């Protein structure tokens, strides 16, 4: 993500992965970070941890989604055989970057839609791989190499 100073990011979801996602966004230089969740209390909890967050009510998501440059799905929506968002993302900016923390399936319905519309999309596979690498190192003090062969193997197994 380039020229982050004036970018606006939205984290959809306020569960377990959200704090790490928020910190990563902040480290990238994006200053304007919002969060939304089906349960508003979880957003309020995150706002207490990260006072710089703006809370977007879930009911306003459909109309607000067009205001963001980076959108991260940190919910369970789209998981294998699971529900997906009950609205589409047609009003997102053409240059939006959509990141889905889900890696199984590799492409959720929302991911597929945005990809077909020509938006930049990334799934959660890299996060999964590098999280595994870090965990392996913490347990074994060995840093396993991540190469194209490993990525292809995981891609084939998750399809």
Residue ranges and their predicted role:
Residues 23-27, 45-48, 112, 116:
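Short, well-ordered alpha-helices that flank and scaffold nucleotide-derived cofactor binding pockets
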Residues 28-50:
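NAD(P)-binding Rossmann-fold cofactor-contacting core
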Residues 96-153:
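Rossmann-fold NAD(P)-binding glycine/threonine-rich loop
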